[in-house]
Structure formats: structure tokens, C-alpha cells
Amino acid sequence: MKGAMCMELYNKYKEMMDNYGQHEIFMINYINSEANKNDVDFVYRFRDKFIALVKLGKTVRDRANVIVSHVDSPRLDVIVGNPFIVNKDGVFLKTVPYGGIIFQSWMDIPLVLVGRVWADEEIKYINTKGVYEFTITSLLPHLDGRKEMKDLKPDKLLVRIGDNKEEVLDFFESVCGITEKDFELADLSFVPSYNVKELGFDKDLIASYGHDDKSCAFASLQAFFDSGDTDVTKIVIFASYEETGSAQTTGCQSEIINDVFLELTDNVKSHRGMIRNSSVISADVCAGYESKYSTHFEECASAVVGKGVGIIPYLGQKRGNDAEFRFRNEIKELAIKNNIPYQIETTKTTEGGGGTVSKFFATKGCRVIDIGVPVLAMHSPQEIISKKDLKAMYDLFKAFYEN
């Protein structure tokens, strides 16, 4: 039965990722459409890259159980201005990294162009998946005596899109309805074209671009819907720009978070009280332990892929958010009570460690903790998680809302 439930969740996740996982604007549209199909009391959508769903509590409305995730993922953005580069070997689009990536891992793989362009006073969306693919080529090792591939610079991240610039521009105008001038301030990116696939003889592992953090976004959305009517108000938030620091208008440093709570209260005083009384899960992935890189992990506090959802009380050199003592233990007891496999995880403080949005909620006075599935090959074009961990994360999120 558990295996069947894992597969059901996996199939839903695969459908979402294959169709909408290429970019956060597609994810926000998907979440909005799902909200329209379900029983939601309030939808707060802001500037195409932020959305929050609210279901009012049956008895308790002066606080909320909140799960927040981000729907952006590392990618290659087409640079603004004039991104076209014409060389003797073809026409290229110049890209810049969005988020932390290892440049070499994004070469010699199939890429698709996604995003949006402002043309003829309207937004035109682009997604070439399933139709047109592109790539960035590497230098053959026979000619790389200077080890240029080892110390790759961002200026080599050029995506070849054709032979002749006029033909390329004619294509964009005839098929997409956009001109060269429209590229100056476009919001376009190249992302891997891979569909979600199963890995291993047991098929327990899931390979996909963008598990960070769309796996957590998916689990929180499903848990929000499946938990039904609850005594306490529940909120699920999907933000963006986490991979670059959450500083933009649709990131978690924005005042937009306060606005969500203001919509649910009568005045600023009660709104601040509601925030301070609320419990928040920062749903973000954690680093999956790998024995071949064991010196980079805290072996006594590492999450192994396939062994359960990761509960992260603190992380990073500066510890980021340090989850309140009582709250972290309440979450642990919730997992035990519901027979949910969990692991305690934290990064090795001498090795750095990533940041999440939890610290921005902590500064507002919320009880907040980081929870997410362990991931292998994080920030690569094809990240890896476990079906069992995805199910455990969903179960814990659902129990959090229900309790």
C-alpha cells in the first residue's frame, strides 16, 4: 500500500515537473490553476512570481500554520541588452548564471529556451520544450592543454541557436512574434530539457532538473489541499529569487509576506501578533550524504537519500536560522506519532552550507524550522531525490497542517 501511495505521489509530481517545472512563472500559473480547482478561502498572487493560498481555521484564526517554499531553480539567464553574438561558427545567445552552479556540468547537455518577452504591448510566453533544443559545447580534451575547461569562465556559456542571424531573427518574428529589440529586457532562460525519470534497479530514485525546490513546493501544495478543513488557519507560500538571496519584490525579504497576514487581520497590531504566534516550515531541500565526499559532511548529522525527510535545526557557517528548542522537538514528535521516517541534518560548519528563507521569518518572530528531502547533485542540471523521501515529506507537511 505504501509503495502504491509513493507511486501515486510520484506520478503527480512527474506530471507537474514535465509540464511546468522549467520556470517559476509556469509553476505559479500551475499553482493558481490548482487553487481554482480546490477549496481555498483566499489567494494572494503578486507579480507573476509569488503566490500564497489561505484556508481559514474552523476555530483558531489568530495564528497560522505556514509552509513556505521557493519555485525558482538555478539556470542560465539570457543576458539583457543585446544577447546575440555572431561568430564564424554560428549565432549564439550569451547567458549569465542564475544561482550557484558548476559551469562545466551545464555544458554538452540538451537545453530549452523558456521565459517571457514583452512585445506589441503584451506578454508573450516562450517554452521550446519538446520542439527545439540547444546546447553549450565544451572543448575537446585533446586541445585543452591549458586546462580551460577546468577553470571555465562564464563568458564561455554561449548557447548556439543557429547558423545565420537573419534566419534566426526571422524565425523569432514569424513563430514567436518577437523582434531583436524585444530581447533587450526579456526574461528568458535556458534550462535542461530532461523529463523526470526513475533511476536504479528498484526505481526508487527520481532524476530531474529543479528538485530544489520544486519537490518541496509540490509536497506543500498537495499537503495543503489534502489536509482539508483544519482547526487552525493554514497558509502555503510560494516565493521566488531564493537562489539569489530573496531580495526582490517576490522574494521572502519583501514586505509582501507581511501583506499576506495583513489581509487576514483587522489592523497592524493584530497582524504582528498573528505572525509572532504562527508556526512556519521553511520547505527546502538539504544535501544528501555521499560517502565518496564524506569529509564535507557531518556524519553524525547527515541525511541519506531514501532514509526519510530531513529535519534541519540549523545550517551553515553562520547557522542561519536556529529553530526554537520546543518547536524543533514538537516537529520530531509529530513525525514519530505519525510513523514518518525522518533524519536530523545539518551542514558541516567549516564547509559553508546554504541559506534558506527561514531566517527571514525568524526575524518576524515566527517559530520556524527547515525541513526538506535530501538531494544528490544539488544545483546540477539533473538532481536526484527518493520517492520514499518525497512521500515522507508530504506526510509530515500534511500532519503539520492537521495538528
Predicted features along the sequence, with ranges:
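N-terminal hydrophobic/helix-forming segments and targeting peptides
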Residues: 1-403
